[in-house]
């Protein structure tokens, strides 16, 4: 069994055969006689992977304490989560979210989030180009910046949705091609590959995006948003399409910069994946620990000291204010020094 109390609040259980049960106000992890206990007052979230069993008593205690329990697939995506039955937010929020999905209000929100993603890609490449004095990286950043400027300022999801998805796609192709100037070729083939990945770098991206998705989904639920009512990714029927909308703002600041650092500093190896390019063992542990650390590290964002985890929740709450009160929505744009 491998358990990692990454912080006082996040407990990662990564091992076959582990069990989680309740003992008074404590959680007990047991694997083959190796026992660890955690006070329920000190836990924010349990992240479970592989085959882990959990008792109903442990789930009830977690619900009473507002503790999130999420189960990850081998690709890092959450496949289920346990949270209290009491609904978060109001009916008004979800009604307004559903109404906005087909109106100009929904388009403005989704366009702002795509613009933030494209701008973040440009900003990251510009920072990499500056630190490496690389003209090609800076040129790619400028090309992506021009694509961000091409996003129409007005429209509806049905009228302009395909256009801004196309802009996002072109920007992504330029961005991931440019990363081949930074990532060693034995780790990265110069293009984005998802499920399955085609190389170690994409395997890390996939898994870490899954952990980020978990955090964004949780923020949407806490803010009272419906994860299934999406604007830009509305075509993903049966999927949590709104989570895919919101996450776009955070991919480069939270995950990409971190995974690039792992690659260029020699902390990423072929042995971190299996023959089908899924992270295993030490690779999975590095991905989880690095992403959670990245989420919790304090940094200056928007002129004040906070964390990416807090910024994600604040972003979800600002979406609620936009939908319910018509407040100005400022998407999450990150600038590297």
Predicted segments, located by residue:
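Active-site helix-to-loop segments that bind/position phosphate- or nucleotide-bearing substrates
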Residues: 1-23, 30, 37, 79, ...
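Short, well-ordered turn and helix-capping elements at secondary-structure junctions
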Residues: 31-33, 50
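An N-terminal structural lobe/cap that precedes and organizes the functional/catalytic core
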Residues: 33, 42, 63-65, 71
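Extracellular/luminal Protease-associated
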Residues: 40-54
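Short hydrophobic alpha-helical runs that function as membrane-insertion/retention elements
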Residues: 46-49, 67-73
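Short gly/pro/ser/thr-enriched loop/turn and capping motifs at secondary-structure boundaries
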Residues: 55, 75-81
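A short alpha->loop->secondary-structure connector
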Residues: 64-70, 77, 86-90
């Amino acid at each position: 069994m491998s358990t990692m109390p990454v912080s006082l609040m996040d407990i990662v259980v990564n091992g076959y055969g582990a069990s989680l049960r309740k003992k008074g106000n404590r959680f007990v992890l047991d694997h083959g006689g190796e026992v660890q206990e955690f006070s329920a007052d000190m836990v924010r979230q349990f992240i479970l992977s592989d085959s882990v069993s959990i008792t109903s008593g442990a789930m009830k205690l977690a619900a009473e304490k507002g503790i999130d329990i999420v189960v990850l697939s081998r690709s890092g995506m959450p496949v289920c989560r346990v949270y209290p039955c009491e609904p978060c937010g109001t009916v008004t929020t979800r009604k307004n979210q559903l109404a906005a999905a087909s109106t100009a209000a929904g388009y403005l929100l989704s366009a702002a989030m795509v613009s933030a993603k494209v701008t973040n890609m440009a900003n990251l490449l510009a920072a990499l180009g500056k630190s490496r004095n690389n003209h090609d990286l800076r040129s790619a950043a400028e090309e992506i910046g021009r694509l961000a400027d091409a996003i129409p300022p007005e429209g509806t999801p049905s009228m302009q949705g395909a256009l801004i998805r196309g802009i996002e796609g072109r920007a992504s192709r330029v961005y991931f091609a440019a990363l081949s100037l930074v990532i060693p070729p034995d780790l990265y083939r110069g293009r984005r590959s998802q499920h399955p990945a085609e190389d170690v770098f994409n395997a890390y991206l996939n898994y870490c995006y899954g952990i980020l998705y978990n955090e964004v989904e949780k923020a949407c639920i806490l803010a009272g948003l419906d994860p299934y009512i999406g604007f830009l990714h509305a075509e993903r029927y049966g999927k949590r399409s709104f989570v895919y909308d919101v996450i776009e703002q955070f991919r480069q600041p939270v995950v990409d910069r971190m995974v690039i650092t792992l690659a260029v500093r020699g902390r990423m190896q072929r042995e971190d994946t299996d023959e089908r390019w899924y992270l295993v063992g030490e690779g999975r542990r590095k991905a989880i620990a690095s992403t959670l650390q990245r989420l919790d590290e304090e940094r200056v964002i928007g002129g004040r000291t906070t964390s990416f985890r807090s910024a994600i929740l604040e972003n979800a709450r600002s979406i609620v204010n936009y939908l319910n009160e018509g407040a100005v929505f400022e998407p999450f744009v990150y600038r590297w020094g």
